[in-house]
Swiss-Prot record:
InterPro entries: Ub_conjugating_enzyme (IPR050113), UBQ-conjugat_E2_core (IPR000608), UBQ-conjugating_AS (IPR023313), UBQ-conjugating_enzyme/RWD (IPR016135). PROSITE patterns: UBC_1, UBC_2. Keywords: ATP-binding, Nucleotide-binding, Peroxisome, Peroxisome biogenesis, Transferase, Ubl conjugation pathway. The active site is at C115. It comes from Saccharomyces cerevisiae (strain ATCC 204508 / S288c) (Baker's yeast). It holds the Pfam family UQ_con. The keyword Cell membrane does not apply. One of its GO terms (molecular function) is ubiquitin-protein transferase activity. This is Ubiquitin-conjugating enzyme E2-21 kDa.
């Protein structure tokens, strides 16, 4: 269990508002994700983990999400990197997939960059928290937005309605990813 007193009194990288907010969120994340109760943990089977990479620095986080059922991402897990700016919660965190980890119309595969409206400064509201942001990324896997693609080719396939081609390409990509990672 992290020493929250030390975290709350650490001011090296961020503002008091940011540190106070992120420590509160961390406590909620630990409690929520530890619960087996589906009401207390609506993210069960969605967000497998959400933790700071280093418990002494709450500016960098890592999440593991499960691919949504009935999508080509089903039965796969994806690592998400989260950078919390010192201006959080007034500005959004920067969230990206691990490089070359996923093929999706709203993700630039080479960098992991995600195109998601709530993560844009002009759309962001401090009401959102890290759990909700990670859940929104998971929902993007379920419901791609082909009108704002970072991968234009995948976006065009979806826009044309060729879902079997989309699913086939993604499944092939993920099978290759798994094959490479197992060697």
């Amino acid at each position: 269990m992290p020493n929250f007193w030390i975290l709350e009194n650490r001011r090296s990288y961020t503002s008091d508002t940011c540190m106070s907010r992120i420590v509160k969120e961390y406590k909620v994340i630990l409690k929520t994700l530890a619960s087996d109760d589906p009401i207390a943990n609506p993210y069960r089977g969605i967000i497998e983990s959400l933790n700071p990479i280093d418990e002494t620095d709450l500016s960098k986080w890592e999440a593991i999400i499960s691919g949504p059922s009935d999508t080509p991402y089903e039965n796969h897990q994806f690592r998400i990197l989260i950078e919390v700016p010192s201006s959080y919660p007034m500005n959004p965190p920067k969230i990206s997939f691990m490089q070359n980890n996923i093929l999706h119309c709203n993700v630039k595969s080479a960098t992991g960059e995600i195109c998601l409206n709530i993560l844009k400064p002009e759309e962001w509201t401090p009401v959102w928290d890290l759990l909700h942001c990670v859940h929104a990324v998971w929902r993007l896997l379920r419901e791609p937005v082909c009108d704002s693609p970072l991968d234009v080719d995948i976006g065009n396939i979806i826009r044309c309605g060729d879902m079997s081609a989309y699913q086939g390409i993604v499944k092939y990509f993920l099978a290759e990813r798994e094959r490479i990672n197992n060697h």
